Amino acid sequence: MPGTMQCLGAEYLVSAEKTRQREWRPQIYRKCTDTPWLVLFFLFWTGLVFIMGYSVVAGAAGRLLFGYDSFGNVCGKKNSPVEGAPLSGQDMTLKKHVFFMNACNLEVKDRGLGPTALCVSSCPEKQLDTLEEVQLFANINGSFLCVYSLNSFNYTQSSSADTLCPRLPVPPSKPFPLFNRCIPQTPECYSLFASVLINDADALHRILSGIMAGRDTILGLCVFTFALSLAMLFAFRFISTLLIHIIISLVILGLLFVCGVLWWLYYDYTNDLSTELDTEKENMNCMLAFAIISTVVTVLLLALIFTLRKRIKLTVELLHVTNKAISSCPFLLFQPLWTCAILIFFWVLWVAVLLSLGTAGTAQVMEGGQVEYKPLSGIRYMWWYHLIGLIWTSEFILACQRMTVAGAMVACYFNRNQNDPPARPILSSLFVLFCYHQGTAVKGSFLLTVTRIPRVIFMCIYSTLKEPQRSAWSRGEFRCSHCGLWCLLKYLYHLNQDAYTATAINGTDFCTSAKDAHTIIAKNSSHLTSVNCFGNFVIFLGKVLVVCFSIFGGLMAFNYSRALQVWAIPLLLVAFFACVVAHSFLSVFETALDILFLCFAVDLETNDGSSEKPYFMDPGFLSVIKRTNNLNNAKSQGQKDALPNEEGTELQPIVR
């Protein structure tokens, strides 16, 4: 009898009889699925392209990257003149540092720093007590510390030198990558300079400047993460019992080491804290949060490892079967490479647009010919739309990878003639994806996106609350909401993978595929749940190992450059990159396991093991399933060793 199924506000007509009679074999003739969602994604990306274009035109990322003076010139670049500002439009190619004429007495006035800022070729590393010393420094180093309109020969002769030159004595300073500023080195001047420059800077600028200040370290850690993920991928390809024990040992050591280092760094910060700097307090609070989270994760993982330690041998056999299935289309192992390349390209583009959004503003000439940049309020608040674009597009790219892997493995699994494997299964799967099922990938990625966004909003709201406002009730509410959304996200992730696999087999839309897959797995859940958990847990430990070593490298690298850096944000960026890259690489095995189990359930549903309807499954896979279920039955109910299907027919080896 036909019925209706509701999915994301739309009703789909589902025939029960048609569902029962579905052949569950890879379809040759297909139709486009979830086309409205593909149109929606296209319209969303039209908005993203508009933001990209407008931010590039209106923004000036160079001001953030290289720093700028008080007259509208970006240091280290050749500038265009600003109308009404006579000292603008100068060639600052050789003048790469920002120097404040009164660095020891900075004030914030109307979103701008009061003292005049100049572009100089080098910072004075020794204290200059007189104008003669300032003039000598200019003649020797070619670095002019007075306003551009005053010639260096007139430093000691002009009556206006007191207002056009820095206040004496000029403190020694050194260049620092944060905004390319000359940072005073005397303790008194440094604390005053830092408290104004950092604490009163725009929050978005502080985050972006922290990322740019540590860009080389971030890039190096990303390369390290990429190499470690690749090594872990090939380690799982040639898995063994010894290797599993090594991975588990490294994970335990890594968790304990990272946890200990985080608590040690937090203790170090609490005993060596500059109360003038809010960024130091932010770093300390982030360090405490990192330490608590790592401790909880360490305890939970150690408990799980201890509980599942006796299933290691079966897990190795299961991964051997998975490797055998992957070997039928070995290029699946290289699938994460192009996925990772596309993700990196998109993230670089996203960060470039974010930099432009953060610096979008119009030049306004003030009294005395100085130039101030007034932010464009409308464009600057578009970063929320930009953030949604980051999450949705990243999830879409990963969804395309999962559907490609599903299509290739399905074609290899449902192949009777083992001597004649499918030709180019990956290319065929890609062709089917881009011609018919992009809308399904968009819909699945949208589900994950709308689940992630509330988590981001909750974290932002909670982080804005001051400590007195964080009552026990609000903390408990936040943790429950965060935990609930995390569980929902994990459920949707597995639902999406099953839906993609069903779509790859039957060519149906997302909701129909999800329903069919859920129904057929539910009938065989007793056979599959425990086995699937073991394999996924070991793969998860591989991801944890990559993330642990990446975070440890980040802790060691960023801790050596604390001064004036919001380095908790770059560390979070490295951790996020490590999670995504490790997941992108090792998800090939995780995806392959999920696909194998769904295909196994389909096999049980549509075949009975007889000579007329033999199973497609590999005998090794059948053996692992039977041994695992026998172990479970012996521990719980002592049931018989044979693994029955729904009708009670004993599974038979595949007929060759």
Swiss-Prot record:
The keyword Transmembrane applies. It comes from the Eukaryota. One of its GO terms (cellular component) is membrane. The chain crosses the membrane at residues 37-57, 216-236, 242-262, 288-308, 337-357, 381-401, 537-557, 566-586. Residues 634-656 are annotated as: Disordered. It is found in: Membrane. Keywords: Glycoprotein, Membrane, Transmembrane, Transmembrane helix. It is a multi-pass membrane protein. The keyword Transmembrane helix applies. Glycans are attached at residues 141, 154, 506, 524, 559. GO terms for molecular function: organic cation transmembrane transporter activity. InterPro entries: Choline_transptr-like (IPR007603). It holds the Pfam family Choline_transpo. Belongs to the CTL (choline transporter-like) family. This is Choline transporter-like protein 3. It comes from Mus musculus. The gene is Slc44a3.
